[in-house]
Amino acid sequence: MSNMSQLFDASRFPDDVKVRANGKATVMTLYGSENGSLRLFSLWEGAILSFNRIYTQVWPLAQNEAANILLLNFCRKGRCEVALEDGQFAFLSQGHMAVGTQQAQEEYRYPSGLYEGVELFLDLDMLAHRPYPLFQEGEVSPEGIVEHLHTSRRLYLGPTPACVQTLLDDLWQLRDSEEVGLLKLLSAQLLWKVERQPLETSPTVRYFTSSQVSIARETRNILCADLSQNHTARELADRFQVAET
């Protein structure tokens, strides 16, 4: 049985998250004053494609995340913040991708309250036990992606290559369709491209420690509490006992 068999089980989420079948897709929806949805397509046992449309600042975390899942996350719009197993925070913004097997430790946060993205979930254990014929024929290797991006120890964060972005745009156009065959082909092609693209390092630091994030959030609260008050960098640095930079 796949590690993802319960990954999107509604019983593992708060009551305001519902899961229902919708044609050839499964839709997970967050109801309430703020909302969002994940539209999920099963490509093969152990391979799931998700179209994410989030209109809230916080998306709930499942009670327990599934083990040994390779997650490829591509941001189209907005920004996502997530706490990782190693105590660091990762920030994924428009035009960037994240690839790895690290587990999220807290709710996913979306500061702007708007996020659009595409995700691919690959169960490494299941795909090793029961390989996906399309991956085999197309020479797509999840293990090869892990090795190429060095994600066995750390989440890979970097710009989405232009050729990958083109495929993401094609996939996004099909987000509300039921063209599962085409979704499978485009997903396999996308993975093939990711595995073979030269590594690019973003000039922007995208990892932060929990203390850095706490300081940033508290600083935001101070600045927004009374916009008529001016606070200098020196004042805030002294308050948190850190350098102005």
Task: List where the protein language model places each region.
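Alpha-helical bundle regulatory/interaction domains
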Residues: 83-212, 216, 224, 233, ...
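N-terminal low-complexity or simple alpha-helical regulatory segments
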Residues: 1-67
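Short hydrophobic beta-strand segments that form the core of ligand-binding sensory/regulatory domains
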Residues: 51-53, 71-73, 116-123
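Generic structural motif
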Residues: 43, 54-59, 77-79, 123-127, ...
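Glycine- and acidic-residue-biased ligand/ion/polar-headgroup-sensing regions
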Residues: 66-86, 124
